[in-house]
Amino acid sequence: MTTNPKPAYQRILLKLSGEALQGSEGFGIDPTVLDRMAQEVKELVELGVQVGVVIGGGNLFRGAGLAQAGMNRVVGDHMGMLATVMNGLAMRDALHRAYVNARVMSAIPLNGVCDDYNWADAIRELRQGRVVIFAAGTGNPFFTTDSAACLRGIEIEADVVLKATKVDGVFTADPVANPDAELYDKLSYTDVLEKELKVMDLAAFTLARDHKMPIRVFNMNKPGALRRVVMGEAEGTLITA
């Protein structure tokens, strides 16, 4: 008789990029991709893992891009935050269809649409086995959703921030442009800063470093990768002190 292996993490913060939701469409939300991600999250919940999620908004609007086009950066960032709420609602709906209880908590009050972010409520929901989707970034302009992921991860005392990307982890160079680039298995925060590796923006990364929040970068497009990460198997790149 085999005993079921236990997950390596009890509580995680999963950071998904908005682009991940668009699939091959190039814009918006691909329902097939959304449903697949919901199923992967469901697997974790069934393992007893507590899951917090932060989703970007780049598939709909990106504040920095709008600012480059001449829009006021604060207005652009507000639009970006609302895009993350739209993605969060879509993810909650996909989870509900997969029979997973989920709540969207927004850093910007949107009465009648989703709940306001509340730290104590979030912890309680997670303990009860519900997935909590943190929307609207940090609620402030000039902060990325990577910053929001690290902030919420630290607040809810997650064991790790899992950054889902389109590549297998952190490489010595851009693996798309350079096929010879090598994948790092483990890195320290100092390594990342000294080598100027693009893991996440500096504000987000230094926040994680200062609070000793481990970050694991992995490929969400790889079937079963999320489960393998949570089970403590070799997948992606782990960044720790």
UniProtKB/Swiss-Prot annotation:
Residues 23-28 are annotated as: Involved in allosteric activation by GTP. UMP binds at G57, D77, T138, G139, N140, P141, F142, F143, T144, T145. SUPFAM superfamilies: Carbamate kinase-like (SSF53633). ATP binds at K15, L16, S17, G18, G58, R62, T165, F171, D174. GO terms for biological process: 'de novo' CTP biosynthetic process; UDP biosynthetic process. Homohexamer. PANTHER family: URIDYLATE KINASE, URIDYLATE KINASE PUMPKIN, CHLOROPLASTIC. This is Uridylate kinase. It comes from Vibrio vulnificus (strain YJ016). The gene is pyrH.
